A protein has these predicted regions:
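Extreme N-terminal, non-catalytic leader segments
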Residues: 1-28
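Glycine-rich, often acidic-flanked micro-motifs
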Residues: 22-37, 51-211
Length: 211
């Protein structure tokens, strides 16, 4: 997961933000967060969405702003990190050379200004989508249980004083007001198309997105 935005002091970050391990993108003003483990394809899907005209906010780490009640999160829109073989999925990435990260793993990190995509520093989170990339067949989506979502987010409440951790948990609970989904997919184009239909349906329905 990425560091908090702007590289500020750790204590200030803990007091200002609630970190969430997730990618963040936006389509026509609707914010979508992708959650899941390290192999779920968060960065890859975020970039696939951006290539289709979405706005990119962050690939692997989003930070909820604790003093806001609208589930607003910020990220690092200036770069995006891929697995070394990302050029096999996205030919335009083949010219970039993987480098060794501090953890010893190879990764491909690319400045978004070289990719011709829309970016933004943050957005409100209207949908949270938990990814299952191992599925074979047509992409599908279903509601995701709130308790499982809270369990997933809880693992990132490990820094700061007890009061800070409590405030971070309270902030993450605001994400339960967003629409929670689990999406199974194997093909990126199917996943992007399904997400676009989901957003179109929910934003056009009475009451809009959210719960």
């Amino acid at each position: 997961m990425r560091d908090a935005p702007d590289g500020g002091a750790g204590l200030a970050q803990q007091r200002a933000f609630a970190p969430v391990h997730g990618a963040l993108v936006m389509r026509q003003g609707t914010g979508v967060m992708f959650c899941g483990d390290s192999s779920a394809g968060k960065s890859t899907l975020a970039y696939a969405c951006a290539r289709s005209g979405w706005t990119y906010v962050s690939d692997d780490g989003a930070f909820l702003v604790r003093d806001r009640a609208d589930r607003y999160a910020v990220g690092d829109p200036h770069s995006i990190r891929f697995r070394p073989d990302a050029g096999e999925l996205f030919p335009e990435l083949a010219v970039h050379v993987p480098t060794v990260r501090p953890n010893g793993r190879m990764a491909l990190e690319v400045c978004t200004r070289h990719l011709g995509i829309f970016t933004a520093p943050g957005c409100a989170v209207d949908h949270v989508v938990f990814l299952d990339r191992e599925h074979r067949g047509t992409a599908s989506v279903q509601s995701y249980p709130e308790d499982r979502a809270l369990d997933c987010w809880a693992q990132y409440t490990c820094l700061g004083t007890g009061d800070v951790q409590t405030a971070q948990r309270r902030c993450r609970r605001l994400l339960l007001q967003a629409s929670l989904w689990k999406m199974r997919y194997s093909r990126l184009d199917d996943a992007v198309s399904l997400l676009e239909r989901l957003i179109d349906q929910t934003t056009s329905s009475p009451g809009g997105h959210g719960r």
